[in-house]
Amino acid sequence: MRTLFLLNPTAGKADCTRTLPQQINVAAARAGIAPEEYTIQVTNHAGHARELANAAAQQARQSGEELRVFTAGGDGTFNEALTGIYGYANAAVGCLPFGSGNDFLRTFGTKEEFLDLDAQLAGGPVSIDLMQTSLGLSATICAAGLDAQVAYGIPKFRRIPLCGGEMAYVLSIVEQLCGHIGRRVEYTIDGETLDVDCLMCAICNGRTYGGGFCAAPEAQPDDGWLDVYIIRKVSRVTIAKLLGMYKSGKHFQNGQLVRAAEPYFIYRRAKQVSLRAADGRGPIVATADGECAPKEQITVQVQPLAGRILLPKPAFERFAAQRTAQSADRT
């Protein structure tokens, strides 16, 4: 088995390449992994993790080996590597959460579990669904509307001197709330057409995005379904109340919207979703696992069990136990 560690020095607030390589060397020795069986590489441009993971997957397949890829960065770095190994049955990707959001792991466990190198090397691979989207492959959530517009606006404010990540985020929110709120959007959800004045929507394989917004608190990443949440257009006063409910995941319990959320949310389960602007105001901004761009039409389709990911030992054991229990319930 080959193991590749991909370190993104620009992810998060601190450069992980300063201390992580030595920690990897120590953990690998404890796990009995010989120096020639693993490689540490540092990414240096956008898309580099995808390129390195793809090259390693090709090489491992040619030599008949299994490949483990661990990304040290955020959701964007993880998604790049996942895209790089897509279609390679011999490869799987795990994440060491050194980014600012790290939403992918929240569906499976805690940040502490995923930072534990010993647990990571003792864990194992599982198969999950992926989403093929207009922004590329996604493991977690594809969102469109107000939240995506905020994310899209952040780089502009980061270019202002002394305006760091948190300040850029706040300024982007203020800009959006001071502008026109809501879009008329036409949705096609497994053949059902909905024409909605909406604030935003989230098409979910995982549970959280945006640094902890629990959009889909009961999503199962290996059930072959997308959980779709549409938030109707509301007043600025109501937005704060809705976003508080949405962030905590309290809008959805026991397989349905809670009563307080019903006037504001639309919920569906689907295999394929597409949406386009129906108000003549140009493209809709969408975001998915680190990618963010305006699109004339956004299409999302589930790819059942198309991804192989690595989970640290505690999360791997929980995941396996849950699936065993579900299989027993079905029989």
What are these regions (language model features)?
Residues I189, Q220, I230-T331:
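ATP/nucleoside-binding phosphotransfer catalytic cores, i.e., glycine-rich phosphate-binding loops
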Residues M1-V69, N79, F316, R323-T331:
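ATP/NTP phosphate-donor binding region
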Residues A143, D147, A202-A216, E291-C292:
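Glycine-rich phosphate/pyrophosphate-binding beta-alpha loops
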Residues T77-A89:
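Short Gly/Thr/Asp-enriched flexible loops that form oxyanion-binding sites at enzyme active sites
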Residues T43, Y86-I203:
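Catalytic core of DAGKc-family lipid kinases
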Residues P9, A72-G74, L96-F98:
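Glycine-rich beta-strand-to-loop/alpha-helix junction loops that act as flexible
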Residues G12-C16, G210, I309:
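Short N-terminal binding/cap micro-motifs at the start of the first secondary-structure element
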Residues R158-A168, G211-G212, P217-A240:
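Gly/Ser/Thr-rich active-site loops/lids in small-molecule metabolic enzymes
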